[in-house]
UniProtKB/Swiss-Prot annotation:
Function of the molecule: Aminopeptidase which catalyzes the hydrolysis of amino acid residues from the N-terminus of peptide or protein substrates.
UniProt disease link: Dystonia 31: A form of dystonia, a disorder defined by the presence of sustained involuntary muscle contraction, often leading to abnormal postures. DYT31 is an autosomal recessive, progressive form with onset from childhood to young adulthood. Involuntary muscle twisting movements and postural abnormalities affect the upper and lower limbs, neck, face, and trunk. Some patients may have orofacial dyskinesia resulting in articulation and swallowing difficulties.
Cellular component, GO, one term: cytoplasm
Protein name: Aminopeptidase O
InterPro entries per UniProt: Aminopeptidase_N-like_N_sf, AOPep, ARM-type_fold, M1_LTA-4_hydro/amino_C_sf, Peptidase_M1_C, Peptidase_M1_dom, Peptidase_M4/M1_CTD_sf
UniProt-annotated catalytic positions: E480
One Pfam family per UniProt: Leuk-A4-hydro_C
Annotated EC: 3.4.11.-
Marked site (Transition state stabilizer) residue numbers: Y586
GO biological process, one term: proteolysis
Gene for this chain: AOPEP
Source species: Homo sapiens
Annotated SUPFAM superfamilies: ARM repeat, Leukotriene A4 hydrolase N-terminal domain, Metalloproteases ('zincins'), catalytic domain
Co-factor note (free text): Binds 1 zinc ion per subunit.
Motif range (Nucleolar localization signal): 689-699
Length: 819
């Protein structure tokens, strides 16, 4: 795929002025309306000004420089003051059915005059424009900047937390007897800093404060990427109200969620893992440094199930016959991008009861597992942490639930349900305590653009992992489970360092899966070498068809993690639609970690990794945090001239294939499983060369039974053959039952069908493009490149059927291929 780079189109601005003020907690109160495809309600933000949180986090690098005396570089928008008498008065005209909203209020379907929505502008993104200082500029009012896109903001007001009975005890200063801005802000300051053991009380106070009356509307405006709020006369973050309520609604075209139908034809909506994350779902602070907690009440028609990334397993509360309410919360501060919701007619599948406590206490710790029980206080900000809970650290299998559309329950019962316990147990045996207390697994609609996505307490999986046996399902499950540690419990402080999430998950999925299968060491090593062989081939392909600047794992180099004085920044290529299909960060990151593990030895490496997890869970990291600790914790004789600078130069800051990896692949011997595949390839080449009419006595070729990864490698080798006859292709299909294999195998099979114009199997290609949308994008390109009229017609026909439901980025990429 020829990727064209355009900074004005592709760069993603993070606008929030997190150096001046931080959101510590969100309270969402939302209604989901499937008829209008809108989510509407309020969000209350509890804030902490910059001076306070900088003192509390003295170990974190100083993010805010001295404030500039110059005015902010972008023009101050004319603020709008929207009088809304009652944005949610009940409408008797609203009809309720299976798919309708249940709400406390009327839904405003048109933007009111004067309401400044986020409008798309044709002008390009300028990093200087978006990285401006929004702090105090003498006589100007302080501006709270939130990341926001595709939202209709109706009203912003200050919340009178002083009106909540019982909260006056949080005011320590006896001179603050009159209710004032300072009085209210002190209440919030004390509330957000309550100790972790009072988390239930804290959540209760947050909920009560969120329902307190307003005490004055605030001026606000919106542009393409932000919501800007100010209060006349409040010139610093300290003076700005620390509890504000925003009334808003999403737009059907908003890019944070997808409104679609599930595989049973029922409507649903879910966060799709958009490049813009959640800023089209609620106004928030997007930069990872803005770690916050949240609680949410979501109402939907009674036939729907609401799943969220909360730590509690919510049950519905029936409000009236046709409406239910769901309540979720989290107590571990995390970036707003990890907030996840899925509302649909999901069916929960029951499984056999697993007693994780029994599993944890039936046997003593092995010597290697003793490393899990590190002594010492956690290094993160205070929250109720599982790593300090003795029973949690020994819990091999956390409570889990599985949800899917009703038509897929059988497939889930056959594969997914029975794989979750051994995969969770395997992850625990490698890394120790699960960072999160529970797990929901949801099979999402066919338009989901990847095979899986992990969030705190919930995981989305594509339907593509349910076919063709256990292998693809198990490996993907292990990949997403690994993200609980790397990507979620430990996050990247700079989003450009994706390898810190995807590289680790890719490396760990093999280790988890081998452990879950209880493979002997030799078998595990062979399978891992085979997967390394496949990834090596994929990395070579990736290097050939991606721009050099997108092949670098640490593109900002010494400026990694840096922001403007306000905290705003720009993510290079963050909006490039082709980026979600690239695997450079997965593959190069995987090979770097594999290189380090081989250099140190598995025992030393994984012992270190457990120590690293214990040290850095609940925190954001940069590459140097991992590499410096690694090198400090290994003996000199195993370091072998490794240094942070060398690793930067060879692996993280250069494009192309790293030189140490090239040397390793040249010197390494082929594993036994790969050699077996080569022998089978030779047989098939021989079969293909035979004349159509064979002698009767000629011996029929006997083919070996192959593992799924071996089948993938076999088909990739056969793709290198210039011609394969229809007879050979038919024999291939019959020998390996290719139409029934997993999606990875079927993808390569479809490539063979397209390359050799095997018309008898075109139905398999059509099926793949419709049912395996997470993997089908490149197949569209191959159909068009062939310049075969029938194949191009097939591609356009499939796209016409699926484009309305297809993921937006995928549809954009495919449309550019077809037209």
């Amino acid at each position: 795929m020829d990727i064209q780079l355009d900074p004005a189109r592709d760069d993603l601005p993070l606008m929030a002025n997190t150096s001046h003020i931080l959101v510590k907690h969100y309270v969402l109160d939302l209604d989901v309306d499937f008829e209008s495809q809108v989510i509407e309600g309020t969000i209350v933000l509890f804030l902490e000004d910059g001076n306070r949180f900088k003192k509390q986090n003295s170990s974190i690098e100083e993010a805010c420089q001295s404030e500039s005396n110059k005015a902010c570089k972008f023009g101050m928008p004319e603020p709008c003051h929207i009088p809304v008498t009652n944005a949610r008065t009940f409408s008797s005209e609203m009809e309720y059915n299976d798919f309708a909203i249940c709400s406390k209020g009327e839904k405003d379907t048109s933007d009111k005059d004067g309401n400044h929505d986020n409008q798309e502008h044709a002008s390009g993104i300028s990093s200087s424009k978006y990285c401006c200082d929004t702090g105090n500029h003498g006589s100007e009012d302080f501006l709270l900047v939130l990341d926001c896109c595709d939202l209709s903001v109706l009203k912003v007001e200050e919340v009178d937390v002083a009106a909540v009975p019982g909260l006056e005890k949080f005011t320590r200063s006896p001179e603050l007897t009159v209710v004032s801005e300072e009085f209210r802000n002190q209440i919030v300051r004390e509330l957000v800093t309550l100790p972790a053991n009072r988390w239930r009380e804290q959540l209760d106070y947050y909920a009560r404060c969120s329902q307190a009356p307003g005490c004055g509307e605030l001026l606000f405006d919106t542009d393409t990427w932000s919501l800007q709020i100010r209060k006349t006369g409040a010139q610093t973050a300290t003076d700005f109200p620390h509890a504000i309520r925003i009334w808003y609604k999403t737009k059907p075209e908003g890019r944070s969620v997808t409104w679609t139908s599930d595989q049973s034809g029922r409507p649903c909506v879910y966060t799709v893992g958009s490049p813009i994350n959640n800023r089209a779902l609620f106004p928030c602070q997007e930069p990872p440094v803005a770690m916050s907690t949240w609680q949410a009440t979501v109402r939907a028609a009674a036939s729907f199930v609401v799943l969220m990334s909360g730590e509690n397993s919510a049950k519905p509360t029936q409000l009236w016959e046709e409406c239910s309410s769901w309540y979720y919360y989290v107590t571990m501060p995390m970036p707003a991008s990890t907030f996840t919701i899925a509302v649909g007619c999901w069916t929960e599948m029951k499984m056999e009861t697993w007693s994780s406590n029994d599993l944890a206490t039936e046997r003593p710790f092995s010597p290697s597992e003793a490393n899990f029980r590190h002594v010492g206080v956690c290094s993160h900000m205070e929250y109720p942490c599982r790593f300090q809970n003795a029973s949690a650290t020994t819990q091999e299998i956390i409570p889990h639930r599985v949800f899917a559309p009703v038509c897929l329950t059988g497939a889930c019962q056959e594969t997914l349900l029975r794989l979750i316990p051994p995969c969770l147990s395997a992850a625990h045996s490698v890394l120790g305590a699960h960072p999160f207390s529970r797990l929901d697994v949801l099979i999402v609609p066919a338009n989901f653009p990847s095979l899986g996505m992990a969030s705190p307490h919930i995981m989305f999986l594509s339907q593509s992992i349910l076919t063709g046996g256990n292998h693809l399902c198990g490996t993907r499950l292990c990949h997403e489970i690994a993200h609980a540690w790397f990507g979620l419990a430990i996050g990247a402080r700079d989003w450009t360092e994706e390898w810190l999430s995807e590289g680790f998950a890719t490396h760990l999925e093999d280790v988890f899966w081998a452990t879950a299968q209880q493979l002997a060491p030799y078998e595990a090593r062979e399978q891992q070498e085979l997967r390394a062989c496949l990834r090596w081939r994929r990395l070579q392909d990736e290097m050939q068809c991606s721009p050099e600047e997108m092949q670098v794992l640490r593109p900002s180099k010494d400026k990694t993690g840096h922001t403007s004085d306000s905290g705003a920044s720009v993510i290079k290529h963050g909006l490039n639609p082709e980026k979600i299909f690239m695997q450079v960060h997965y593959l190069k990151g995987y090979f770097l970690l594999r290189f380090l593990a081989k250099r140190l030895g598995d025992e030393t490496y994984f012992s270190f990794l457990r120590k690293f997890v214990h040290t850095f869970h609940g925190q954001l990291i940069l590459s140097q945090d991992f590499l410096q600790m690694l090198l400090e914790n290994i003996p000199e004789e195993k370091r072998l001239e490794l240094s942070v600078e060398n690793i930067y130069q060879d692996w993280l800051e250069s494009s192309g294939i790293p030189k140490p990896l090239q040397r390793e692949r040249r010197a390494g011997a082929e594993c036994g499983l790969a050699r077996q595949v080569r022998a089978e390839v030779t047989k098939w080449i021989g079969v293909n060369r035979r004349p159509r009419k064979r002698k009767r006595r000629e011996k029929e070729e006997v083919f070996e039974k192959l593992l799924p990864d071996q089948l993938v490698l076999l088909l990739e080798h056969l793709l290198e053959q210039k011609t394969l006859s229809p007879r050979t292709l038919q024999s291939l299909q019959r020998t390996y039952h290719l139409q029934d294999q997993d999606a990875e195998v079927r993808h390569r099979w479809c490539e063979l069908i397209v390359k050799h114009k095997f018309t008898k199997a075109y139905k398999s290609v059509e099926r793949f493009l419709q049912e395996d949308q997470a993997m089908g994008v490149y197949l569209y390109g191959e159909l068009m490149v062939s310049e075969d009229a029938r194949q191009q017609q097939l591609a356009r026909r499939c796209f016409e059927r699926t484009k309305e439901q297809m993921d937006r980025s995928s549809a954009q990429v495919v449309a550019e291929m077809l037209f």
